[in-house]
Amino acid sequence: MEWDEFKGIFYTNPIFALLAPGISLNNIKELCRERDEILHEDRKEEIIKIIHKIKKTYEALPDPDKDFAYC
């Protein structure tokens, strides 16, 4: 996922349009919009957990621990 000029998300790969069960696109967008402000470990961990869940479900990311930037 990448940012467009309006701070929205657009997908660079169709696999990212698929979300792990229980994770809404709204939740992903909210977390990603706050990404630049996330310095607190609790919020960072929340995003990493979502990335892990997507990885486990779809095997979409090569290394979820290093793919925090996918948001």
From Swiss-Prot:
This is Putative uncharacterized protein DDB_G0291420. It comes from Dictyostelium discoideum (Social amoeba).
